[in-house]
């Protein structure tokens, strides 16, 4: 069945009429940061956000453990994949230190704009809780796809957004100067 959510898998596994095969995906779910906005234009703030997030906990909370942490737009099994998860590892103390170095007074208030998909809404809850531990108050803004496409993607009206990329890894997509990040 297409579009089976991770939380639906157990009902299929428990039914002898179905054989469940779980495999990898080329989808990449990312937390996009609008680096055109202050204070997100400071790389220390972006690194602090990355260090505040436990990717494994997000996968567990939003995907019931189905998924693998990544540190870039490459997924395990993709041509040229290099594990970069250690570049910005989960480290709460480092996150707090980077925020202080950037001169950020906490609480730092940001908006996390979420499309209507379960991975985004559930992942958003986990990320909001993790960011709070370092003094970042992320308010979720749940939007429908049309709003996300025009406001977030089109007009770059967001601080943070959680989105899955499923398009082919095509340099033409990622080299667009006005791509939403």
What name fits each language-model region?
Residues 72-73, 147-181:
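Acidic-aromatic pocket-rim loops
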Residues 22-28, 74-75, 180-181:
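Short Pro/Gly-enriched coil loops immediately N-terminal to beta-strands
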Residues 14, 21, 40-132:
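Append "and occasionally in soluble cytosolic enzymes with long acidic Gly/Pro-rich linkers
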Residues 2-8, 55, 74, 144, ...:
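Beta->alpha turn/N-cap motifs
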Residues 1-37, 60, 160, 164:
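Extracellular/periplasmic solute-recognition and catalytic clefts
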Residues 4-7, 116-118, 140-150:
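Short helix-initiation/N-cap motifs at beta->coil->alpha
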Residues 24, 35-37, 114-116, 142-144:
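A mature extracytoplasmic/lumenal domain signature
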């Amino acid at each position: 069945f297409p579009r089976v959510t991770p939380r639906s898998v157990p009902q299929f596994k428990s039914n002898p009429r179905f054989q469940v095969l779980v495999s990898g995906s080329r989808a990449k779910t990312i937390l996009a940061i609008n680096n055109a906005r202050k204070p997100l234009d400071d790389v220390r703030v972006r690194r602090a956000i990355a260090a505040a997030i436990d990717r494994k906990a997000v996968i567990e909370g939003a995907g019931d453990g189905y998924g693998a942490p990544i540190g870039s737009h490459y997924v395990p099994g993709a041509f040229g994949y290099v594990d970069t998860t250690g570049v910005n590892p989960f480290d709460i103390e480092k996150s707090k230190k980077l925020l202080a170095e950037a001169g950020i007074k906490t609480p730092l208030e940001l908006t996390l704009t979420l499309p209507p998909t379960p991975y985004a809404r559930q992942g958003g809850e986990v990320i909001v809780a993790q960011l709070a531990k370092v003094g970042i108050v992320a308010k979720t803004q749940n939007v429908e796809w049309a709003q996300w496409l025009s406001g977030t993607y089109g007009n770059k009206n967001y601080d943070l957004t959680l989105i899955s990329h499923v398009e082919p890894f095509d340099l033409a997509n990622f080299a667009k100067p006005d791509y939403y990040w």
